[in-house]
């Protein structure tokens, strides 16, 4: 027995979808780095800390990038570092590459920021996002014509990004007309910029672990040194790993913690992807 439910309105399955409203591009070609000439390349998502990282070596120097989204500070943070001082040379820019949106980009050289603001074309949902660069050592110059920052001989670079919309889960308009997106974003960027990278990182870890550490699952196998893609291949070929099953369970918990904190439900199906 089955039932077919028809909801009022046309195109009932089209409930909208999540939209990206800002791409950050990092170009390391100034250092001579390509996909083919780096060594010891490794990517990792640490479920225990909620931090994604990329590491590699080039000309006997080790480079590392760490990424996380901090719920307490409401910012996305990327930190770039090297094993030797003055070895970071790259360019950074932010672009709007989404045909469903319209917006404009402003370049604030004095504050070392880049901001995109605009709206969704079909429903006028407003958005704003700002990227700010913070350097330890080295220098930063601005190519205003191409709207790109160029970093030279830096020891460490921290990129802070904040984003917000005027969405409000309140029928029937689903808009917060009182929200000043500029004030919200500027406050987040300014407050986060006053903290060191280690402070931002520690705040994020403590917040993440306050939720993640509530549940543990032990199926009797631990293979943390085996790459995940290898575990998946072995599982598909009949070498069943209980550790992979544990990992999948905890990964689902991580996605919920990272993506849905009560402000908006997680995407649970193909619709809206």
Residue ranges and their predicted role:
Residues 1-273:
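Aromatic-residue-lined binding/catalytic grooves and analogous aromatic/hydrophobic interfacial grooves
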């Amino acid at each position: 027995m089955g039932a077919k439910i028809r909801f009022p309105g046309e195109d009932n399955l089209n409930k909208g979808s999540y939209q990206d409203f800002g791409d950050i591009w990092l170009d390391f070609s100034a250092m001579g780095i390509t996909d083919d000439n780096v060594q010891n390349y490794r990517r990792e998502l640490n479920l225990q800390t909620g931090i994604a990282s990329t590491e590699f070596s080039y000309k006997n120097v080790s480079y590392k990038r760490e990424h996380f989204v901090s719920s307490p500070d409401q910012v996305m943070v990327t930190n770039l570092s090297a094993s030797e001082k003055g070895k970071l040379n790259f360019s950074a820019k932010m672009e709007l590459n989404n045909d469903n949106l319209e917006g404009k980009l402003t370049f604030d050289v004095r504050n070392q920021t880049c901001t995109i603001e605009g709206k969704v074309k079909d429903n006028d949902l407003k958005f704003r996002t700002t990227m700010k660069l913070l350097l330890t050592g080295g220098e930063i110059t601005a190519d205003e014509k191409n709207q790109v920052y160029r970093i030279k001989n830096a020891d460490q670079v921290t990129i802070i990004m904040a984003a917000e919309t005027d969405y409000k889960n309140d029928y029937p308009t689903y808009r917060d007309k009182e929200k000043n997106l500029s004030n919200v974003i500027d406050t987040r960027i300014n407050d986060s910029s006053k903290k060191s990278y280690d402070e931002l990182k520690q705040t994020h870890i403590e917040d993440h672990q306050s939720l993640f550490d509530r549940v543990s699952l032990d199926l009797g196998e631990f293979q943390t040194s085996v790459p995940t893609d290898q575990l998946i291949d072995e599982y598909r070929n009949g070498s069943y790993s209980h550790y992979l099953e544990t990992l999948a369970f905890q990964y689902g918990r991580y996605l919920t913690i990272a993506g849905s904190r009560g402000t908006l439900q997680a995407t649970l199906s193909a619709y809206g992807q």
